[in-house]
């Protein structure tokens, strides 16, 4: 953050921090940048720097005889014994994300802030040779579109393996600020690309698979890396109409908070046993998230079952933001105290390190209050083997991972697999795709590659990326396969200049196939950057229209790229546009993946995990309106409540082959169940009655086409009489991916449906089973349907602790 006025740090902290920290700040809000408008915090070097990392020496160092080095003691006892050795200044110096360590104890500095959204970021990459790159996977929104939970887990496991290899070389931390499990509620949001999409049940499954993949199979004894579920909670706006994320106060009903904005964090804490949670910049209902004990204690620890000694980190500078711009605290010292007492253990920033001494002097905090958070952090580090000897792999199975493991896991080519599985075929007129090598031999085919994504490299990665081993553009991929490529950028992402149109039309004229690759990228959607419009930007549609007019009988394929959707209704309705695909941010192998989908080496089976709205949607009501249900100018948010007509619906996705979907022998078309009977079933092994399976939705899936293909399924529920109005249009209750269904083969799809899938959330936030009639239906086509009648008395299956 930009701070122009300063005053000395409290004297008791100055001796330790004088060399590491600049002077502290004056307390007048008027002195600072207006963070109600500015969405990027100006972080100090101490916060953002990456530092060389090393392990404490428990064999020969000063700590060798202390309990912290006793591998038979509990992680908490070991951590608590270490923190008890700190002076107050040393304790405070280790409350920030860049912990300064304690040199007299042989405790190295530690950097909490490592990123792992879709690969290692904020690692200490070498300039060349070993450790100069790590695998860069597709952005989560594309990976989730594959509807393959095993794939999510595998990606996270690879990231964790590579992270531990880097950690062993002193180049990466033992915890990561990932995953981002906020839901992509409004299409203008700049960080939707980082998320699993707009559906909260998808986000919850993504959270579970990613977190358990990152943390390993035995996190209590051998934590691989500590995951951080972020951003908790109600965070999904960056800077829309100058409403800065740093100062937003989001008004959210208890109903929506319970039903939409927190279930994924509940699953992360209760089921995935996430070791860390990040509180968000924004306030919810008047209280900054990092100063809200209702969020951090009542919900997270008392209700969601957060692990006993898990720690909460602020988003970077969010502790400071409690003071400026929220104005919830009268000074930075007061803001630090508010955050500590609410349950924010570690400050990603420098507010704690500069001002906690003042908080203690003012009587707002005790040493014990501060110790609690640092003990929690170091408990996690103990679980990850930070203090353990490296004598045998049996002591810690991850301490001998090395560069060879990075090479091995990258060679599995899972980044490519994730991209090909996630790409969504939106339109395919007259089955023009795939452009097979038989019909279009590479040696005799000229491909015009046009548009601002046609030669994309870094663009493929989206945001939060580190060094990738390679970045394959669409142009390079087609050239590598032997096609002659006529490349012309034609226009930029947001350009209104037509100076490149002539070259683009010339490239198309002499080609056999025209591929336009465009859409949006991180110049329009990013952290601290929302879109104002969800129309295609600049003059891209004008160029596509000219290409369509000039195409004649040539195939014109449009690749719609970027994390958020754009209104492609004109392309959907243009008969000259042969095919339309959504490719997201496909990662290091993105060009290969796009090429192989187009040419049929891989067949598409992804489905949209966001709604493609008409452009007018973003102009109808404020993006800061958090109410999901339709009211006034708000036509309803997400596919669950939207009352308008989508361009392409959530769950849309085409195949190259055809599938016949029918009821299986185990499908019962009507099921009657008694609520009290359901709830009397044994469920002691489950964390919640909401997880109890009620029935299996089954269907026969037969490949009736000419190509082997994966098949993806979404099962939706709807009701018009169970519980009070208004009723959602439908909601997702399960999904799956069947791999490699051969031509003529029939597979049985089996999707379990749990108690929670039939529960509706009342105005108090309670999840309730109401008597009534539900319909379960397969995909958007609804060819397989099951009627479920719940009888008996309504029952609360999950009690929501309202905020007093």
UniProtKB/Swiss-Prot annotation:
Family: Belongs to the glycosyl hydrolase 3 family.
Record's subcellular location: Secreted
Protein's name in the database: Exo-1,4-beta-xylosidase xlnD
Superkingdom of the source species: Eukaryota
Key word Secreted present: yes
Sugar-bearing residue positions: 29, 124, 148, 242, 251, 357, 390, 413, 444, 455, 573, 665, 696, 718
Signal peptide: 1-26
Biological role stated in the UniProt entry: Xylan 1,4-beta-xylosidase involved in the hydrolysis of xylan, a major structural heterogeneous polysaccharide found in plant biomass representing the second most abundant polysaccharide in the biosphere, after cellulose.
Keywords associated with the record: Carbohydrate metabolism, Glycoprotein, Glycosidase, Hydrolase, Polysaccharide degradation, Secreted, Signal, Xylan degradation
Alphabetized Gene3D superfamilies for the sequence: Glycoside hydrolase family 3 C-terminal domain (3.40.50.1700), Glycoside hydrolase, family 3, N-terminal domain (3.20.20.300), Immunoglobulins (2.60.40.10)
EC number: 3.2.1.37
Catalyzed reactions: Hydrolysis of (1->4)-beta-D-xylans, to remove successive D-xylose residues from the non-reducing termini
Pfam families (alphabetical): Fn3-like, Glyco_hydro_3, Glyco_hydro_3_C
GO MF annotation: an example: alpha-L-arabinofuranosidase activity
Keyword Glycoprotein annotated: yes
GO-annotated cellular components: extracellular region
Residues annotated as the enzyme's active site: 315
One GO BP annotation of this record: arabinan catabolic process
Involved pathway(s): Glycan degradation; xylan degradation
């Amino acid at each position: 953050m930009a701070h122009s006025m300063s005053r000395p740090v409290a004297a008791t902290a100055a001796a330790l921090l004088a060399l590491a920290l600049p002077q502290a700040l004056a307390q007048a809000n008027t002195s600072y940048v207006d963070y109600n408008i500015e969405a990027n915090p100006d972080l100090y070097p101490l916060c953002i720097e990456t530092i060389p990392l090393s392990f404490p020496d428990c064999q020969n160092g000063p700590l060798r005889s202390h309990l912290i080095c006793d591998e038979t003691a509990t992680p908490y006892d070991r951590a608590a014994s270490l923190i008890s050795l700190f002076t107050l200044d040393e304790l405070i110096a280790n409350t920030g994300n860049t912990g300064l360590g304690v040199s007299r104890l042989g405790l190295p500095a530690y950097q909490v802030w490592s990123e792992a959204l879709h690969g290692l970021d904020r690692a200490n990459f070498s300039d060349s040779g070993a450790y100069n790159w790590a695998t860069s996977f597709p952005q989560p929104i594309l990976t989730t579109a594959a509807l393959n939970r095993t794939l999510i887990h595998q990606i996270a496991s690879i990231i964790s393996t590579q992270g531990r290899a880097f950690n062993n070389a002193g180049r990466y931390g033992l915890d990561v600020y990932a995953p981002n499990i906020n839901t992509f509620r409004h299409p203008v949001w700049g960080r939707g690309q980082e998320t699993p999409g707009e559906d909260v049940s998808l986000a919850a499954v993504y959270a579970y698979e990613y977190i358990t993949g990152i943390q390993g199979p035995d996190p209590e004894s051998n934590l691989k890396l500590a995951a951080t579920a972020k951003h908790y909670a109600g965070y999904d706006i960056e800077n829309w109409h100058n409403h800065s994320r740093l100062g937003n106060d989001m008004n959210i009903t208890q109903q929506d908070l319970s039903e939409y904005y927190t279930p994924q964090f509940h699953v992360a804490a209760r089921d995935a046993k996430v070791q860390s949670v990040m509180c968000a910049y924004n306030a919810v209902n008047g209280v900054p998230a990092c100063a809200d004990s209702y969020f951090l204690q009542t919900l997270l620890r008392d209700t969601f079952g957060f692990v006993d000694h898990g720690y909460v980190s602020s988003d970077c500078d969010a502790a400071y933001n409690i003071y400026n711009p929220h104005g919830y605290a009268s000074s930075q010292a007061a803001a630090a105290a508010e955050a500590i007492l609410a349950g924010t253990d570690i400050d990603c920033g420098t507010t704690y390190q500069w001002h906690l001494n003042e908080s203690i002097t003012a009587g707002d905090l005790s040493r014990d209050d501060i110790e609690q958070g640092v003990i929690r952090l170091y408990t996690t580090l103990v679980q990850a083997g930070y203090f353990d000897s490296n004598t045998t792999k049996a002591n810690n199975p991850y301490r001998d991972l090395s560069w060879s493991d990075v090479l091995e896991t990258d060679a599995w080519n899972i980044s490519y697999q994730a991209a090909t599985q996630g790409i969504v075929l939106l339109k395919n007129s007259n089955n023009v795709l795939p452009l097979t090598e038989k019909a279009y031999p590479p040696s005799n085919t000229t491909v015009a590659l046009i548009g601002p994504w046609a030669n994309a490299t870094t663009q493929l990665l989206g945001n939060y990326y580190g060094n990738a081993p390679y970045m394959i553009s669409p142009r390079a991929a087609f050239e590598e396969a032997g096609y002659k490529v006529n490349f012309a950028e034609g226009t930029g992402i947001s350009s209104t200049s037509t100076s490149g149109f002539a070259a683009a039309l010339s490239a198309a004229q002499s080609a056999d196939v025209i591929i336009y690759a465009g859409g949006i990228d991180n110049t329009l959607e990013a952290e601290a950057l929302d879109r104002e419009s969800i129309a295609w930007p600049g003059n891209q549609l004008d160029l596509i229209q000219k290409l369509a007019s000039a195409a004649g009988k040539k195939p014109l394929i449009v690749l719609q790229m970027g994390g958020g959707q754009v209104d492609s209704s004109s392309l959907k309705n243009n008969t000259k546009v042969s095919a339309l695909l959504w490719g997201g941010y496909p990662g290091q192998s993105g060009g290969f993946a796009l090429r192989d989908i187009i040419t049929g080496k891989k067949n598409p089976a992804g489905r949209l995990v966001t709604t493609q709205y008409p452009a007018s949607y973003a102009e109808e009501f404020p993006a800061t309106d958090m109410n999901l249900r339709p009211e006034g100018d708000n036509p309803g948010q997400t596919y669950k409540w939207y009352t308008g007509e989508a361009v392409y619906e959530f769950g849309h996705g085409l195949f190259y082959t055809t599938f016949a979907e029918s009821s299986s022998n185990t499908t019962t078309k009507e099921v009657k169940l008694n609520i009290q009977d359901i709830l009397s079933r044994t469920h002691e092994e489950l964390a919640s009655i909401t997880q109890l399976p009620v029935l299996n939705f089954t269907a026969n899936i037969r490949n009736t086409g000419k190509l082997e293909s994966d098949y993806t399924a979404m099962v939706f529920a709807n009701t018009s009489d169970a519980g009070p109005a208004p009723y959602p249009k439908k909601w997702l209750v399960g999904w799956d991916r069947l791999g490699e269904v051969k031509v003529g083969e029939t597979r049985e799809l089996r999707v379990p449906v749990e108690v929670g899938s039939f529960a509706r959330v009342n105005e108090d936030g309670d999840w309730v089973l109401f008597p009534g009639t539900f319909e379960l239906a397969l995909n958007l086509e609804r060819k397989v349907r099951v009627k479920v009648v719940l009888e008996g008395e309504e029952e609360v299956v999950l009690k929501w602790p309202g905020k007093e």
